[in-house]
Swiss-Prot record:
Function noted in UniProt: Presumably involved in the processing and regular turnover of intracellular proteins. Catalyzes the removal of unsubstituted N-terminal amino acids from various peptides.
Gene: pepA
Top EC class, one word: hydrolase
EC number: 3.4.11.1, 3.4.11.10
Name this protein carries in UniProt: Probable cytosol aminopeptidase
Catalytic residue list: 274, 348
C-alpha cells in the first residue's frame, strides 16, 4: 500500500473518500463541505437513518467512479484507541470491496483521546499494514487478492510535516513488524539458529550501517558460556549467537543501546518434556530474537542517529542422550553457578550468558526480550507484556514508549524477597523459583547477571503470538522498542 499526505479541497476531488460521521447526527468538517457539493445528500442519509455515527456503521455513496464512504466514528473527542482501530479496519475493508484504487482519508479529523494528528496517521498506517499481513510462503495455493485499493492519501489542513513523519515512522515500524512475523512464523525445520544467523548476515548486506558477527559453539566454549551451551546439548543444530551492530551516532564511540532476544527456535522442554498439546507453538519461543531482528530492520530504514546492538541468542532445547538434566550444576560465563531444577526453564540460562557477553560493549543500557514464562501469561494475559527492571528511569521510559506505541507493557515488582526463592543448597542459584510469582522470579534470576549496566526485561510470552483462528506471530514488541529508540534521539 502506498501512503501520502495531501492538503486539498475535498469538494473538488474526484477520488474516493473516507468521511467521518459522528453520533448525534454530527457531521465532520469534511462532511459538511462535501454535503454542500452533494446538495444535502449526506445530511439526508443521516436523517433517514441510512448511516449513523455509531462505530462500525458504513454507507457507500456512488458518484460515477467515485465512492464516498461515510464512516460512523462515535462521539467526537471521546474516541478510544481501540475504537479508532475498529473504525480504520471497517473503512478499509469496505473500500477493498469497491472499485476504488485510491482513497483520500479524511478520518484524520477524528479526535482520539489524548492523541494528536501524528498518532492518528501513524496508527492508521500500522493498523492497515497489520491487517494486510499474510504468511503463506509454504502454501501451494496462495490467497486471491481482488482488491484494487493501492493508495491511501491522508487529508490534512495543517501539520502536514507531522503527518508525513508519521507515515515514515509507521512504514518503517510496519516493515520491522513484518520482518519479525516472517521469521517467527517460519517452521522450526527451517528456522533454526543457523537460519537466524543467516537473516542477520543478510540484514548487514542490505544496510551499510549494520555489521553482523556470528558466534558459534566453539567460541562460546572458549568464553565459558556453559549455561547457554547446556541448553543446546540435546540438539544437532548448533547454537548461534548473532550480533548485529548498528552504528550511526555522530559520536562513533557513544555507548550503544543493547537489545538481546531469546531465540529458542524450538523448545520441547528438554528432559523436562512439555505436554504434546500445542507443542507446535514452541517454534514461537524465538519471538524475542525475532522482535530484535524486526527492530534492527526498522532503525536501519529510519537511519536513527544512535548506536544500537541487536543480539539474537539462537538455540534449540530438545531431549536427547546428550541433553542436560535436572540436577546438573552449570558454571555460567559470569562465574555464578546454577542448579538446574527444570530443563524447561532454559530461556534464562541462554539469556544469563548472553547478558554477561554484552558487557564487552560497555552499553548505555540493555533490554532483553523473551517469551520467558507461562506465569506472565497467567498474570497479564495476552494484552500486556511483562516489564521487569532494576532501573526506575529505564522502566519509566519503556512504559512511556509502550503507551505512545499502543504496544502495552505492565511493570512487575522486583524486590529482594524474590531472590530468596532462587536459593539453591548446592549452587549459587537455582534456575527455578517455585510456584509463585514465576514471571518475577525469572526476572530476578536474570538481574543477577546485569550488575554492570541499567537493565530491563520484557516477558512477551503472552503477547508474541496468537492462538486459535488468528494463530500467528504478532510482531510485538517491535513497535514499543522502536518508539523507545525514537525517544532516545536527542
Amino acid at each position: 500500500m502506498k501512503y501520502s499526505v495531501k492538503q486539498t479541497a475535498l469538494e473538488q476531488e474526484n477520488k474516493s473518500l473516507f468521511i467521518a460521521i459522528f453520533e448525534n447526527q454530527e457531521l465532520s468538517p469534511a462532511a459538511l463541505k462535501l454535503d454542500l457539493k452533494l446538495k444535502g445528500e449526506i445530511t439526508e442519509a443521516v436523517k433517514n437513518g441510512e448511516v449513523s455515527g455509531k462505530i462500525g456503521r458504513i454507507l457507500v455513496l456512488r458518484h460515477g467512479a467515485q465512492r464516498i464512504i461515510l464512516v460512523g466514528c462515535g462521539k467526537q473527542n471521546e474516541v478510544t484507541e481501540r475504537q479508532y482501530k475498529q473504525i480504520i479496519q471497517k473503512a478499509v475493508k469496505t473500500a477493498k470491496e469497491t472499485i476504488a484504487t485510491t482513497i483520500i482519508n479524511a478520518l484524520t479529523e477524528v479526535k482520539i483521546k489524548d492523541r494528536d494528528l501524528y498518532w492518528n496517521v501513524r496508527f492508521a498506517v500500522e493498523t492497515i499494514e497489520e491487517d494486510n499481513y499474510i504468511f503463506e510462503q509454504f502454501k501451494s495455493k496462495k490467497s486471491e487478492n481482488n482488491s484494487k485499493l493501492a493508495e491511501i492519501i491522508f487529508y490534512t489542513e495543517e501539520n502536514h510535516e507531522q503527518a508525513e513523519l508519521a507515515i515514515r515512522h509507521a512504514t518503517a515500524i510496519s516493515s520491522g513488524v513484518k520482518a519479525a512475523k516472517d521469521i517467527a512464523n517460519c517452521p522450526p525445520n527451517i528456522c533454526n539458529p543457523a537460519y537466524l544467523a543467516e537473516q542477520a548476515n543478510q540484514l548487514a548486506g542490505r544496510s551499510s550501517l549494520i555489521e553482523t558477527t556470528v558466534i558459534g559453539e566453539k567460541e562460546m566454549r572458549k568464553l565459558g558460556m556453559n549455561a547457554y551451551l547446556a541448553v543446546s546439548c540435546g540438539s544437532k543444530n548448533e547454537a548461534k549467537l548473532s550480533v548485529m551492530e548498528y552504528r550511526n551516532h555522530e559520536n562513533p564511540n557513544a555507548k550503544p543501546i543493547v537489545l538481546a532476544g531469546k531465540g529458542l527456535t524450538f523448545d520441547a522442554g528438554g528432559i523436562s518434556l512439555k505436554p504434546a498439546a500445542d507443542m507446535d507453538e514452541m517454534k514461537y519461543d524465538m519471538c524475542g530474537a525475532a522482535s530484535v531482528y524486526g527492530v534492527m530492520n526498522a532503525i536501519a530504514e529510519l537511519q536513527l542517529p544512535l548506536n544500537v546492538i541487536g543480539v539474537m541468542a539462537g538455540c534449540e532445547n530438545l531431549p536427547d542422550g546428550n541433553a542436560y538434566r535436572p540436577g546438573d550444576i552449570l558454571t555460567t560465563m559470569s562465574g555464578l553457578t546454577v542448579e538446574v531444577l527444570n530443563t524447561d526453564a532454559e530461556g534464562r540460562l541462554v539469556l544469563c550468558d548472553t547478558l554477561t557477553y554484552v558487557e564487552r560493549f560497555e552499553p548505555e543500557l540493555v533490554i532483553d526480550v523473551a517469551t520467558l514464562t507461562g506465569a506472565c501469561v497467567v498474570a497479564l494475559g495476552q494484552h500486556n507484556s511483562g516489564l521487569v527492571s532494576t532501573d526506575d528511569n529505564l522502566a519509566q521510559d519503556l512504559e512511556r514508549a509502550a503507551k505512545l506505541a499502543n504496544d502495552k507493557a505492565w511493570r512487575l515488582p522486583l524486590s529482594e524477597e524474590y531472590q530468596e526463592q532462587l536459593k539453591s543448597k548446592f549452587a549459587d542459584l537455582a534456575n527455578l523459583g517455585g510456584r509463585w510469582g514465576g514471571a518475577i522470579t525469572a526476572g530476578a534470576f536474570l538481574s543477577n547477571f546485569t550488575k554492570n549496566y541499567p537493565w530491563a526485561h520484557l516477558d512477551i510470552a503472552g503477547t508474541a503470538w496468537l492462538q486459535g483462528q488468528n494463530k500467528g506471530a504478532t510482531g510485538r514488541p517491535v513497535s514499543l522498542l522502536v518508539q523507545f529508540l525514537l525517544n532516545q534521539v536527542k
